[in-house]
């Protein structure tokens, strides 16, 4: 009987050693190859303010600086409206915006102050007058850099930094993406994949926008790239499925919904707003679009 038990144990160990490497290989194989794609340049808009990002609607583009917004005509390039805050004021670091109907929704933070605090600021697109503010206060998530609609709620990105503006006990790897309901109650979220945070360090995502294809498009602080992420079948980390070369210098991006798959970004050095045709991204088998994820049990 003792010999039989020993043989059973030995066979179990041998079987484990044979299966474990195979299981590990299968797990590693679940990560798809990152698609390498190229955006096509479409248009350039000259501004004096585009240092943090840009937004767009059918007829206009919007330049974003720390406490300045400017509205320009697409057709002629004329300045239509401008909103100007004050240095050290309540709105001190506008990170990104997106246009929706008659409103411009913007992510604001107190960067580089500590502790990190954030707010959502809303402006009327006709005159750029400020019409609403939603304070998120101090959040463990980090500093709000971008947000977008997801269903009836919100998808938002929060930054942590290695240097200036960082807490000292959370580095760039703690940058997170969270899902909120329409009242900004947190429903869940994801880590960002290492292959993306490495490209953004020592900063985090400066811009983010959910595509019509249900995938998430992120831009970093300074690289001429946009990273495309999908939701995993299981686990807490988004999957990096594509990197798109884009003629920008990082900073915030937004979709121009007046055309299909047109993204806008900026050249910080020249303060230009630039638009691009973004190629289709193939969703690898076994992954999900963020719009397909169910945040209820």
Which stretches of residues belong to each language-model region?
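Beta-strand-rich domains and repeat architectures in extracellular enzymes and scaffolds
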Residues: 43-67, 93
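Beta-rich catalytic cores
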Residues: 49-50, 92-93, 116, 141-143, ...
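Short, conserved, GDST-rich strand-edge loop motifs in beta-rich repeat architectures
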Residues: 108-117, 157-174, 274-276
């Amino acid at each position: 009987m003792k010999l039989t038990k020993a043989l059973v144990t030995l066979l179990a160990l041998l079987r484990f050693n044979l299966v474990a490497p195979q299981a590990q290989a299968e797990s590693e194989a679940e990560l798809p190859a990152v698609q390498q794609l190229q955006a096509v340049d479409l248009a350039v808009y000259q501004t004096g303010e585009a240092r943090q990002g840009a937004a767009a609607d059918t007829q206009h583009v919007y330049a974003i600086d720390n406490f300045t917004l400017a509205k320009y005509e697409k057709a002629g390039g004329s300045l239509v409206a401008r909103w100007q805050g004050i240095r050290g004021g309540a709105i001190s670091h506008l990170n990104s915006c997106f246009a929706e109907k008659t409103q411009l929704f913007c992510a604001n933070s107190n960067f580089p102050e500590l502790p990190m605090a954030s707010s959502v600021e809303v402006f009327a697109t006709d005159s750029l007058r400020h019409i609403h503010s939603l304070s998120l206060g101090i959040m463990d998530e980090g500093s709000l850099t971008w947000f977008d609609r997801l269903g009836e709620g919100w998808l938002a990105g929060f930054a942590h930094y290695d240097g200036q503006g960082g807490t000292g006990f959370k580095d760039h790897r703690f940058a997170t993406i969270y899902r909120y309901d329409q009242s900004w109650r947190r429903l869940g979220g994801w880590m960002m994949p290492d292959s993306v945070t490495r490209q953004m360090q020592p900063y985090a995502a400066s811009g983010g926008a959910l595509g019509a294809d249900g995938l998430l498009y992120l831009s970093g602080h300074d690289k001429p790239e946009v990273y495309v992420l999908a939701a995993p079948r299981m686990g807490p980390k988004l999957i990096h499925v594509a990197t798109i070369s884009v003629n920008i210098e990082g900073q915030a991006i937004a979709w121009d919904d007046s055309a299909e798959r047109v993204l806008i970004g900026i050249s910080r050095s020249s303060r230009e707003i630039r638009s691009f045709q973004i190629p289709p991204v193939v969703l690898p088998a076994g992954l999900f679009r963020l719009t397909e994820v169910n945040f209820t049990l």
